[in-house]
Amino acid sequence: MSATRGGPDQGPSQPQQRRIIRTQTAGNLGESFDSEVVPSSLVEIAPILRVANEVESSNPRVAYLCRFYAFEKAHRLDPTSSGRGVRQFKTALLQRLEREHDPTLMGRVKKSDAREMQSFYQHYYKKYIQALHNAADKADRAQLTKAYQTANVLFEVLKAVNLTQSIEVDREILEAQDKVAEKTQLYVPYNILPLDPDSANQAIMRYPEIQAAVLALRNTRGLPWPEGHKKKKDEDMLDWLQEMFGFQKDNVANQREHLILLLANVHIRQFPKPDQQPKLDDQALTEVMKKLFKNYKKWCKYLGRKSSLWLPTIQQEMQQRKLLYMALYLLIWGEAANLRFMPECLCYIYHHMAFELYGMLAGNVSPMTGENVKPAYGGEEDAFLRKVVTPIYEVIQMEAQRSKKGKSKHSQWRNYDDLNEYFWSVDCFRLGWPMRADADFFCLPVAVPNTEKDGDNSKPIVARDRWVGKVNFVEIRSFWHVFRSFDRMWSFYILCLQAMIIMAWDGGQPSSVFGADVFKKVLSVFITAAIMKLGQAVLDVILNFKAHQSMTLHVKLRYILKVFSAAAWVIILPVTYAYSWKDPPAFARTIKSWFGSAMHSPSLFIIAVVSYLSPNMLAGVMFLFPLLRRFLERSNYRIVMLMMWWSQPRLYVGRGMHESAFSLFKYTMFWVLLIATKLAFSYYIEIRPLVAPTQAIMKARVTNFQWHEFFPRAKNNIGVVIALWAPIILVYFMDSQIWYAIFSTLFGGIYGAFRRLGEIRTLGMLRSRFESLPGAFNDRLIPDGKNQQKKKGIRATLSHNFTEDKVPVNKEKEAARFAQLWNTIISSFREEDLISDREMDLLLVPYWADRDLDLIQWPPFLLASKIPIALDMAKDSNGKDRELKKRIESDTYMKCAVRECYASFKNIIKFVVQGNREKEVIEIIFAEVDKHIDTGDLIQEYKMSALPSLYDHFVKLIKYLLDNKEEDRDHVVILFQDMLEVVTRDIMMEDYNISSLVDSSHGGTWHGGMIPLEQQYQLFASSGAIRFPIEPVTEAWKEKIKRIYLLLTTKESAMDVPSNLEARRRISFFSNSLFMDMPMAPKVRNMLSFSVLTPYYTEEVLFSLRDLETPNEDGVSILFYLQKIFPDEWNNFLERVKCLSEEELKESDELEEELRLWASYRGQTLTRTVRGMMYYRKALELQAFLDMAMHEDLMEGYKAVELNSENNSRGERSLWAQCQAVADMKFTYVVSCQQYGIHKRSGDPRAQDILRLMTRYPSLRVAYIDEVEEPVKDKSKKGNQKVYYSVLVKVPKSTDHSTLAQNLDQVIYRIRLPGPAILGEGKPENQNHAIIFSRGEGLQTIDMNQDNYMEEALKMRNLLQEFLTKHDGVRHPSILGLREHIFTGSVSSLAWFMSNQETSFVTIGQRLLANPLRVRFHYGHPDVFDRLFHLTRGGVSKASKVINLSEDIFAGFNSTLREGNVTHHEYIQVGKGRDVGLNQISMFEAKIANGNGEQTLSRDIYRLGHRFDFFRMMSCYFTTVGFYFSTLITVLTVYIFLYGRLYLVLSGLEQGLSTQKGIRDNTPLQIALASQSFVQIGFLMALPMLMEIGLERGFRTALSEFVLMQLQLAPVFFTFSLGTKTHYYGRTLLHGGAKYRSTGRGFVVFHAKFADNYRLYSRSHFVKGLEMMLLLVVYQIFGSAYRGVLAYLLITISMWFMVGTWLFAPFLFNPSGFEWQKIVDDWTDWNKWINNIGGIGVPAEKSWESWWEEEQEHLRYSGKRGIVVEILLALRFFIYQYGLVYHLTITEKTKNFLVYGVSWLVIFLILFVMKTVSVGRRRFSASFQLMFRLIKGLIFMTFIAIIVILITLAHMTIQDIIVCILAFMPTGWGMLLIAQACKPVVHRAGFWGSVRTLARGYEIVMGLLLFTPVAFLAWFPFVSEFQTRMLFNQAFSRGLQISRILGGHRKDRSSRNKE
């Protein structure tokens, strides 16, 4: 067992593994692990080293010989040590052998090594193999497998030793070895099903459904085996397919198990009670087949080909044929590697291979050869991988290389989608079968450097003209995609805007539209529509041009016709419009004058409009009749196709996505209401009030300009009009997002309330409804035997009353089940340390139902303190029975407590008392009392004031019973006598009957004189009178005594049990969820099976002790932090492991391990995730037990079964084994640890931690990509090649810990890949390589930062039933959405904002998206996929580099486009971690914004935008990319407004028009900007948040939290994140450069350095903030219009707020951001950074230069369009200079253009001077120091002189100097931006150095501007205090000493370190 023990020194310093090998460190981790640290080219010797480690303890010499043999074999495998790491490995091994040779020789028993080996082999064979075989049923298969493998290796070594010593091997040994060899073939490590003949008695193999599937697959009758085939035992169809098509052996084994489990699970659902005759049901077969081939059949139909699934007519053969077809598909899928992302490519391969299969079975003869049909690629080993998969894979790989890690333009390489969509056209059949190597699919443009391939097997590169190019769609970086994808929405908004402006212009009342003229004018919207149609058609052609090579003729024709028809309408409509007027307006008059103006025909225009709209009529009809639309879209009739061809191009996906009529009605109503509100608001508040001021401004004349006006005679003041209207129009396009937030909050809230969310919010509410909880448990979590559909809804849940006290027979079962489930949940709380031992006792229900108590036993926390209160009431009751009874019965729980205590009192007394006389006395006393209870005069008859005294005695008795010690016997006897006395004397008041009975029992003293001692008889005193101490003590008895003790002694109320907030939240959510609508639970055996898949790269697995204890720069270690944040959980942990302090923990290895686990369960670690997911299995085992247990077992309880199974009956027939087998059938958990192989070989501690997890959870499976060096197969070449495998490993369950077994992983499957799996984004491919090892019908994708809870796992089988119901009446769900609970919001206010924002999105947001809007996609992680649906449609994520950056949402897009259906369920939740520091949050937001930028360009969004109906398209827009685009518009609005104001102020127009209302008091503009501010401060986030908190925790809480958030500066956070989103979204659309940003998963309470913040936010926030500040300052100086207006003040404040936030939020939210010492350190650090010289290899963190070059890298890949846009945007910085030079005192008199020219001269002069200085510095500063100083002095003097002259002669003022700075600074910045954009040109001109110097100057100024205010504030200590309070208010309110965490505890540490 040494493999699982790791000492404290075994921390992160693991990579020094080599040293561990060389030095002998017996029993250390390194020792047993050295068999794992083997170079990849020597993989074959690992088993030998494993055996050596295993036998070392029993025979060191044999271990030595094994190692020696391993060394020899290593030398044979790689004689020249050419493999990586081989030489070092051999050296280390040799050194070890030299060291061990002599000591082991001394210890040798036999004369020679050969004899020693033989004797050991025989000993091993007898001790292990024979002994295990004789153990019959109890043989542990894992141990047998291992024993056979070990014996095999030992024999191999033995043979080698005998050969060296030329000794014959004994006959006996050879015979034994023959048996071993035969068995080793059979006993291979298996995954779930052991399919070898000897395992037929394993529990899982005895299930009839499994047997049926196995038998069905073994039906190989009539299959034509190839010649020379050796028949094996138990051959099945998959073996035949392997022989014929050349699949890999492990792939066949993997898919065999997959298919058997799939069929068995579906079979058992068809027949809930299967007959014992195992025969596979045809219906089950058909169901699986239908799901598996639905996509394939659809593909065949789409391409007009007959499918290859030909079924025979004979019934017997039918089943065989179906199974063959399914097995073939799964085998292709299982080996397809990256081709799995291309579902239609797999269809193509399958189509041909299935046809070959049919040909072989039908005995067809090939027309070419005249022989029977054979597969085109033959059946030799690995033929399928080499000849089918690899060629296609190589194309994917080459294309991925051409993407240059995503830096190339999307249009220059084909991504997975392009390659897959090649198979959407009939042309794909030109590929042929066998595939032609010269087909266009395999062609690549212009030579690709073939570095990675070996010369021979690379394809000849074909010239570019054959390259297929992009298919169907080109992702081009452009904002136009937003308009193109959602053109209907933009058209609608623009037309509405036009109509509203016309109406407002002509009268203003909406009713005026009915006036003839206005109506005619409004009709002009159709002309606009035609123009937009033309724009759309042209845009389509331009953006799709790069895909023209792959387009068919009719698609090209459609594009061209669309342009021509749109152009025609653009001519026809205006002309007919002009002729509809008698007296036409200006624009129409012009047209009329061209064509002759005589005619007048109004009807012509109407006819034209109707014709123009006719195609839209079709769309309208299709919208109203969704079924018709579905039929038309799927139809293959020519006429229909022609009709549809015009309205939308024919595509394989995106057809038939309609919803049911009711769903359609719901989301249509939502949007109709929303749009109506929005338009009314826009019209009445923004547009109409602005019309009159606009008309006035257009009439006004301005002659007095304050700058050089280029167009002084321009009419209508058009510039002013644009400046006024632009912000309003932008807000008009954006404010739908605000309305969406409002409406979604309302509807989401109402919907949530109807779903019964938040009915149980607090523990008080739970207490009040606890009586109905057992009913709910049994109703929801226990399958209903009758299998009927239960009624749903509120009445159903409430009608289930479970409050009777008596327990009828079937209620007894219900109570037992409730107890099992409830106690499991409570125990899991205890294991997680959420509650203490006492709290657990108070919360548990008795496991062992006490049958003598005829009532329900509630958990003690409900009954606590009831008995002492009842006693007081009885004591003071004064003989009034009825009154007391009424008072007790008014409290149900008190009634239960009193009855239970009395009953238990009776039972315990009767159980303990054994003597006959004593029994008699007691029976009579109880009979008397019971009689009085029945007649109801107990209190009248008896004296109750003595009751407390009896109570005290009884409590003492219970205490003695709890301790159960022999020495207390005498005390117990006296106690009984005391109790008897109290009862008879004080309570019954000398009742004559009783007294006489007691006296007679004592054997009184009637004849005088003394009786001898031995004859004296005292009650209870004789030896057999009472049973004490109790022997044997059962668990049930212990539990009973403990419970009664709690009931009697708990004085205080248990209102605050459990006290832990997390435990409370979980209990209340779980209880509440049981009252919500959820499907009925099926039996575990009949439920849908499912898998969980977690991709893992290199994150934390388990914190090492060193990680936990190493303090950060503030002296805070993770452990200290966790102890302070979770103080109660830490104390509970110490209590659980029975330690008093941290020091005690470190004394034992086992406790140390516990400590590491405790900390890891509170971080975002893989350990936490695995524990959470393994609750599913625990839950299934428990539920299987409840399903299968007989009445007796059920009453004994699950705990008893578990205990029994551990003690004795490990038999495969035991109930426990059956429960485990069912759990195995239904649940698999695969963690895809991409790097596990590499970690293992390098001795990385993470590999050991993962191994620990597998040991802890034997059913956990780990998949990884193994990179192995193998010698090249081709003999002509030397050297090694890298080969990649997909590997699945497990650690076998080891039952007997005493054996030599070490816990090492076993390889189950090892499937070779065509090459490296990671070609795209990484995570999707990591999921994809492991998905073949998943099982079942559901697949839950879980990220490694998630968590799960025991109580939620119990609801999983209910959730999976959702797959069987049609949610919208049209289709079954393909993805079930789950809600998440964000568990990282506990400490800082930022984490709290983030978790609130995230929580509201995953609850109220997604609830609304799923229903009514029907546009929920897949947003990451806990969603459950319909596995068969997705594995045949491209998997659970998309993987193309960059475009699929947020890979998960594309799974949702894909699902929806392929007619899936995504739902959302709120009765079950999964935990999730989020980032907690501002920098991590910003990185996360940047990643999401980048992802949205890429989505905007993607084909999926384009298709959804075009294929959804109008309203669903609106939902799709506003919930995906629209949210980000609206954010962008929000920021743009501010810019446009400020630049508009700048134009008005500097040109003098504002002054000239200052009397105009439009300038002075512009309400619409104020409202528009107010709505912008709403978005800015996070209104869109806060509303749903408020509603959700209100729903789930009460509206008072919501309101107080809202106020708190404002106080903690939430608006600052939201305004700041607005900037992040805008910057990264905009930059991605323009330039690309989106990359996966790894965000933190750690604990963030550390201070971020100023330089870090500067690097992160400089471009996204600081530059923009300073630009806006500049605009505001200029406006403050020169603007005059309406300073006094309040609304204006508020708007200005809002803008200044944005500026302040963007500049200072990072410092505000930075822990210790205002601490003086930190500020000083930051300044030094920043100075060092800004002045460091960059260069190759200098990272951005070290030098400003490197960072600056990196920061503009995106411009290099941006393409011409991006550069042009960048330059145009930079031109805005020249406006300042142009405007401001005319506002100087010197230039007041002249408005000549020369002034502007002179200002440029000044700029160039300044630049020249700067250049001179820098050249001087380079040339002179070293040698001619004096010269250089003179030059500098001269320049300075000249500068001063010029300033003085200007002040004296030209009357220059201080303001002028400031204005000059304001004018010239932006110009310089603009020039810098342009220089950066044109870097290659500037470089060639030799100016790049100067540009860099200028840029550094700007950065220093910016840094100073930011740093100064922060440093100033840091002078005042109270600022730092305030900041800490604001940041960590959550912690303060929980009483945590955050100051200790922040300030660290350095003194404390240092003193400890000294010790």
Swiss-Prot record:
Pfam families: FKS1_dom1, Glucan_synthase, Vta1
EC category name: transferase
Keywords: Cell membrane, Cell shape, Cell wall biogenesis/degradation, Glycosyltransferase, Membrane, Transferase, Transmembrane, Transmembrane helix
Topological domains annotated Cytoplasmic: 1-488, 543-558, 626-660, 739-1517, 1588-1597, 1683-1688, 1783-1792, 1855-1856, 1921-1955
EC nos: 2.4.1.34
Extracellular face of the membrane: 510-521, 580-604, 682-717, 1539-1566, 1619-1661, 1710-1761, 1814-1833, 1878-1899
Transmembrane residue ranges: 489-509, 522-542, 559-579, 605-625, 661-681, 718-738, 1518-1538, 1567-1587, 1598-1618, 1662-1682, 1689-1709, 1762-1782, 1793-1813, 1834-1854, 1857-1877, 1900-1920
UniProt GO cellular component terms: 1,3-beta-D-glucan synthase complex; plasma membrane
Catalysis performed (reactions): [(1->3)-beta-D-glucosyl](n) + UDP-alpha-D-glucose = [(1->3)-beta-D-glucosyl](n+1) + UDP + H(+)
Biological role stated in the UniProt entry: Involved in callose synthesis at the forming cell plate during cytokinesis. During plant growth and development, callose is found as a transitory component of the cell plate in dividing cells, is a major component of pollen mother cell walls and pollen tubes, and is found as a structural component of plasmodesmatal canals.
Family: Belongs to the glycosyltransferase 48 family.
Protein name: Callose synthase 3
